[in-house]
Amino acid sequence: MRTTKWLMTAILGLLMTGSAGSSTAPTPEARQALAPTGKLRVALQLANPLNVIQDSASGEMTGVGFDLGKELARRIGVPFEPVLYPSVGALLDSGKSGAWDVAFVGFSPARAKEWDFTALHLEVEFGYLVPGGSAISTMADVDRPEIRVAVQEKSGPDVFFTRTLKNAVFVRAPSNPGALEALKSGKADVMGSIKPVLFELSKQLPDSRVLDGRPGIDPHALAMPKGRDLGVAYAGQFIEDAKSEGLIKAVIERAGLRGVAVAPLK
């Protein structure tokens, strides 16, 4: 395991070094739009491997958003500053006051009214986590009046499952760990989220399992505050380059994610 992790880190480093010239250097105006404070402040949701996971022993951070944000900062020639949040709701609320410059989040038409987005960089499967011994064995068992579904409030999964589940009862928590706690304590029968989060959290709940199948896909993209058109244009080209160079595939593999695919080129 340690050898595999070292190898993926080495490959990622080579990709980043080898692709140094793939994106044209930004104009001063584009750099200012991306990093008006002189640093690229990248908003990241903790305990979400699509954003960032921190090793409790070493303190090392990994995750698709963390690695891509760090690389974008390197390419535009400014320091990388991760800005960490416990939930996507807190992340988005903080962005309204200008606390960050870019974020890697689920795309939706509602969010596009508040933020500018690049083309998609990830397609992420939704799924369900059930505890050991659960009578819920298939996705078809979930949408019933007696089934309580834990979700992180204001998240993409919250929006998706609220729209698609017609009979189940929702138990909303302020964060993914909070939704897991509802499942652990018996306040919920199943947790709905994106599969990378579910697989990560399942490590904390022995004998739990992620149900087979996928009820839907959560599209993810880079988001920026509105009004920074030159910055969004540069970030959009960075995302396309990262897809074509194999960089996004490499950061997915480094994070060991399941249920995630690189989005098609624009």
PLM ranges: what are they?
Residues R41-P49, S58-R75, F107, G127-L180, ...:
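Bilobed "Venus flytrap"/periplasmic-binding protein-like clamshell domains
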Residues A25-G106, E245, R254:
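Extracytoplasmic small-molecule ligand-binding "clamshell" domains
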Residues R41, G77-P79, K96-V105, E146-R148, ...:
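Alpha-to-beta junction loops
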Residues S23-A25, A30, G156-A173, V210-L211, ...:
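Ligand-binding clefts/hinges and TM-proximal coupling segments of bilobed small-molecule sensing domains
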Residues A25, G63-R75, G133, A140, ...:
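Extended ligand-binding regions for polar small-molecule ligands
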Residues F66, K70, R74, P79-D143, ...:
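Acidic, polar ligand-binding/catalytic clefts
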Residues G89, G106-E114, F160-F161, K184-G216:
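A ligand-binding cleft/hinge motif common to bilobed small-molecule-binding domains
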Residues L46, L122-G132, K195, F199-E240, ...:
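Periplasmic-binding protein-like
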